[in-house]
Amino acid sequence: MIPEGTSDTASARGAMKPSDPRRVIKTSDTVALQIVRDIKARGLVKGDRLPSETSMLQEYGVSRGSLREAFRLLEVQGFIRFKPGPGGGPIVGSVEPENLARTSTLYFHLGGMTYGDLFSTQELFEPLCARLACANPDRHERMASFLHGDALLGSADRADAARFHDEVHQLAGNRVLALYTAAVTHLISTDIMATMDLAELSASMLEEHRQLAQVIADGEAAEAERLMSQHFKAQHGYCRQRWPSRLNELIEWR
Amino acid sequence: MLPPESAMLEQYRVGRASLREALRLIEAQGLITLKPGPGGGPVVGDIHAANLGRTASLYFRFSGATYRQLIEAMVTMDPWLAELAALRADRDMANELVALCIAETKAVRGDSEGAVRFAPGFHQAVYELSGNPVLSTMTAAIDAVFIEQILRTVDLSSHQGQFLDDHQAIAQAIANADAELAKTLATAHMQNVAACCYEQAGAQLDRRIEWR
């Protein structure tokens, strides 16, 4: 049972940072925390059913308003979902970098940050992931399907390109860096790349993915880092040339 | 102060419940505060990377990331910002950072908690000099998780002299626009911090990141 209005801010964090910027912890946050802990404790995975609202109300001993707010906080981030209809109710969702990206853009937008800032960040994260991927023992297997990119399929299917980069992020091994990189790359691809005509780039992009897949499969870390850096600098250069104003646009919150 | 609820209801043409939920979602990120009582209402807050860190740590937790991975990410990202700061920083601001470092070093020398207290301010100042607010925000979010969760169990106070010297040398390299040196020194400094954590907390750092 969680007492209404519980706050752990004062006691726990005071010593580290005298001016604590973090907002006050509300009951709904504490309930959300408890739901997350219980998902782990009960070994629930994506798609599993959570206890019903009625039983959670009893278990956590909070008001319906606080519980629903907790649900909503987790639902916005995609960690729980609601199955509609009879027999429906809260189920376990999944971790999607695009949801973290979306929340981050709220900060980026209010902070007056631009797509140019996002580009420079991607130029650091992506080559790092390529380098780290070279140390992963699964790299041959995971890169295999990208080794024989068929240039005739040309128009470098965007979904396929995204899949290639997803694999590299996951191969990087460090899940913090992988999530951050995926979030940045997702934002650039939906907000910038999806609005650009990439026809001129697509053939070379496909070939670059093939080369990258090869050097990563071979574990050539320095070369993978160099090629990945070149790969994104080429895309950014293309965008800079065609749509220079886009770089100074504020990152949108969607 | 944002417009009062009644004005927003009219402006956005939504139900009261939807508006309150929208405000609450933004409040959950610490970007607005809902002032209670008469004359209260939504107030625009500051943008604190610590709040993004709190949300991000939920993702880290669900994706199975460990504290060791968080530290590794920090050891990688912080030196990027030191390098950018040396490349781009305004010379006057960089010199101010050096002066601040020297003053702080004198002030906290011998105060066992002093270095730890000053560290977040130093790193934040470097981030501000970097000219890349996106990378700065993302790094500061990780730093906040590190401070809130790892520094609770690890005591760095016995290394304070070394850390203060490191900070001063990094600030000097930034002021001299020596990007390579700034990055090298920042990397060594962060690896040093990481080594202290590994030494003290060891296997505890292989646990999954908590959300709190």
What is the predicted role of each segment?
Chain B
Residues 1-76, 83, 87, 203-212:
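Short linear motifs at protein or domain termini
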Residues 4-5, 131-133, 177-178:
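Short loop-to-helix capping motifs
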Residues 12, 63, 108, 153, ...:
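Flexible interhelical turns and helix-capping residues at alpha-helix boundaries
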Residues 14, 32, 44, 126, ...:
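Hydrophobic aliphatic residue packing
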Residues 24, 28, 43-49, 110-118, ...:
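An N-terminal domain-start capping segment
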Residues 70-152, 163-169, 181-196:
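Conserved amphipathic alpha-helical segments that form helical-bundle/coiled-coil interaction surfaces
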Residues 155-158:
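Structural signature of alpha-solenoid helical repeat scaffolds
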